[in-house]
């Protein structure tokens, strides 16, 4: 038995934690003003279209303040970037207002975990992953929201199944196998920006539901400015309007393929990727398209947790 055609949309909300270990912040706006506006717009569009999203949130962002000390995590110096202040002083590292906005929406969005401090799970011990997930779930408790059943590992890393189960996780997002590593720069640019989006079937591994996705952003358009960053120079001679039309068409055709094949299209991005006017234009139209196809009964729009429940029932 297979799922009917479905769409899953996941959005990574990381802000200053995204590249804190690399000391890179130029992709973000000052005091996250643009990211906050983008989230507000996105929630409005989702409400109009009745489209739920899975928000993959770094647990530290649920805090309104801290002293910068997070005892018990194995390893040294990981929290050097933590300002140890509060949301008013350093809104890139604390964002309870954003989580409030998500949870206050009439649309049943899902707040899933992206670890507590954006830790690449494949680069640390299982004990560290365990601490990260425990602390993230504790942050959910402290904020007054349910534990996350779904998990998006930072930077497409993987986590031990036993650690996931111990922390209440039963659904994960994982990239489809891809030949990107074997491609030259030109081939990568083509694959990331122009190749069709193909829906796929999920799977259950050791009791954990896996929703496949691309290894590169798919909701946001990689050949347009991403956040505050310029696109690769090879795309700049192409008119912006043409790039926007092509990406919207690419997304909508992916939905159509999911309908025809009774498979699942999982598109994702970072919040910062979408935080400029060009990206927002595309996403607004795509959300409306998905909502219309859902209203016509042609497709289901699922959160990651919904997807996990559904696929376990079919296996």
Give a label for each model feature.
Residues 129-140:
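An active-site-proximal "capping" alpha-helix that borders the catalytic cofactor pocket
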Residues 7-11, 53-55, 109-114, 149-151, ...:
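Hydrophobic faces of well-ordered beta-strands that scaffold small-molecule active sites
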Residues 50, 171-176, 241, 245-315:
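C-terminal domain-boundary segment and adjacent tail
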Residues 2-101, 107, 147, 282, ...:
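Active-site beta->alpha N-cap acidic-glycine motif
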Residues 23-34, 80-92, 117-127, 147-149, ...:
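The substrate-binding groove and active-site-proximal loops of carbohydrate-active enzymes
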Residues 16-19, 61-66, 119-123, 157-162, ...:
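Short catalytic/ligand-binding loop motif for oxyanion handling, primarily in non-cytosolic enzymes
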Residues 83-88, 142, 146-261:
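Active-site-adjacent pocket scaffolds in enzyme catalytic domains
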């Amino acid at each position: 038995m297979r799922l009917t055609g479905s769409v899953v949309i996941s959005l990574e909300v990381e802000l200053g934690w995204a590249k804190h270990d690399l000391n890179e912040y130029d992709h973000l706006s000052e005091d996250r003003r643009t990211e906050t506006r983008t989230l507000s717009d996105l929630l409005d569009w989702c409400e109009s279209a009745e489209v739920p999203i899975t928000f993959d949130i770094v647990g530290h962002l649920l805090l309104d303040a801290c002293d910068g000390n997070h005892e018990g995590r194995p390893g040294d110096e990981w929290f050097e970037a933590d300002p140890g202040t509060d949301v008013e002083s350093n809104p890139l590292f604390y964002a309870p207002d954003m989580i409030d906005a998500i949870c206050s929406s009439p649309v049943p969005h899902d707040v899933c975990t992206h670890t507590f401090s954006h830790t690449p799970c494949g680069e640390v011990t299982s004990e560290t992953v365990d601490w990260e997930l425990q602390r993230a779930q504790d942050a959910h408790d402290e904020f007054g929201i349910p534990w996350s059943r779904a998990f998006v590992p930072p930077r497409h890393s993987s986590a031990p199944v036993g650690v996931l189960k111990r922390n209440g996780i039963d659904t994960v997002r994982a990239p489809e196998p891809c030949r990107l590593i074997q491609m030259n720069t030109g081939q990568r640019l083509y694959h990331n920006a122009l190749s069709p989006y193909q829906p796929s079937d999920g799977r259950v591994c050791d009791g954990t539901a896996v929703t496949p996705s691309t290894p590169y952003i798919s909701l946001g358009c990689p050949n347009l400015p991403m956040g505050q960053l310029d696109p690769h120079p090879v795309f700049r001679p192409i008119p912006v309007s043409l790039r926007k039309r092509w990406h919207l068409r690419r997304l909508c055709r992916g939905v159509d393929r999911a309908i025809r094949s009774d498979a699942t299209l999982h598109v994702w991005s970072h919040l910062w990727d979408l935080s400029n006017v060009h990206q927002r234009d595309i996403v607004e139209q795509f959300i409306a398209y998905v909502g219309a196809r859902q209203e016509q009964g042609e497709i289901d729009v699922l959160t990651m947790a919904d997807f996990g429940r559904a696929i376990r029932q079919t296996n």
